Regions:
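Short, charged beta->alpha transition segments
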Residues: 18-22, 37-38, 66-71, 115-119, ...
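Short glycine-enriched loops at secondary-structure junctions
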Residues: 35-38, 86
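Feature captures the catalytic cores and cofactor-binding loops of soluble hydro-lyases/lyases
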Residues: 1-27, 44-57, 147-237
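Conserved mixed alpha/beta catalytic, RNA-binding, or beta-rich assembly cores of soluble enzyme
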Residues: 12, 62-63, 83-187
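Glycine-rich nucleotide phosphate-binding loop and flanking beta-alpha elements
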Residues: 37-39, 137, 172, 205-206
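Hydrophobic alpha-helical segments and helix pairs
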Residues: 46-101
Length: 237
């Protein structure tokens, strides 16, 4: 996976070894990649540096925890930088939509979902929500986006329209530390759950796959994707 690159594989909990490796490589910048998951402390062996860091992290929200991690690395003279700095082509454009435009009802549902996420963001909760018309079916918790989508399938009223999945950065979230991610894998979960309408926040979403690949997968699955900036344009009646 990392052929052609200098790499080191370290167990979770060996923070001191990680810092030593970074300094040995004269690294002064760090980009965080991958899903933020909290391991059970009983399953890992912590060194002294990890123990000191864990004391600050206990039972904080994800955004707060990542800020603490970034501050810790900053104390070691290592700056945490945004993935977008190195992968600008993987950032969702401000204006983007697939072939089918949203209906007026889908547009209203997406705007309602955004209001829900805006209010929850101050509490460091959720990057995603699924609504049907004005009814909130699911809010992303510790399980992650795809698992949230999977558990929503049985909650959708198949006799009613306007079920929409929305993903965006939390209000006040530092996207340099944790930019929301969307890709083909999430599209497959949406398709299985019968959700055909997606609204995303342009310039605040990192794409797990090239945009043309996502576009093709969405069209094949019959899923319409639109950014909020494009949503303000004309929708179908």
């Amino acid at each position: 996976m990392f052929e052609g690159f200098e790499s080191v594989c370290l167990p979770v909990g060996k923070v001191g070894a990680l810092i030593a490796s970074l300094k040995q490589a004269e690294c002064d910048k760090l980009a965080l990649v991958g899903q933020f998951k909290r391991p059970a402390f009983s399953d890992i062996s912590l060194d002294k540096s990890a123990l000191a860091l864990m004391g600050r992290l206990m039972l904080t929200g994800d955004d707060a925890a990542l800020r603490i991690v970034a501050a810790y690395f900053d104390e070691q003279n290592i700056a945490v930088v945004s993935n977008a700095e190195y992968l600008p082509q993987q950032v969702l454009p401000l204006f983007y939509r697939t072939q089918r435009q949203f209906t007026a009802g889908e547009g209203d549902a997406a705007k309602h979902a955004r209001t829900v996420l805006d209010r929850l963001g101050d509490l460091d909760i959720g990057q995603s929500v699924i609504v049907q018309q004005r009814r909130v079916l699911a809010i992303e918790g510790a399980e992650g986006t795809n698992e949230m989508i999977a558990r929503t399938a049985e909650l959708i009223d198949k006799s009613q329209p306007d079920t929409v999945f929305v993903k965006m950065a939390k209000s006040g979230q530092d996207i340099a530390l944790d930019m929301p991610v969307f890709g083909v894998e999430t599209l497959s979960y949406l398709e299985k759950s019968g959700i055909r309408t997606v609204c995303l926040e342009g310039e605040k979403i990192m794409l797990a796959d090239p945009l043309d690949v996502i576009n093709a997968a969405a069209d094949e699955a019959g899923i319409s994707i639109c950014t909020f900036a494009s949503l303000s344009e004309k929708v179908d009646d």
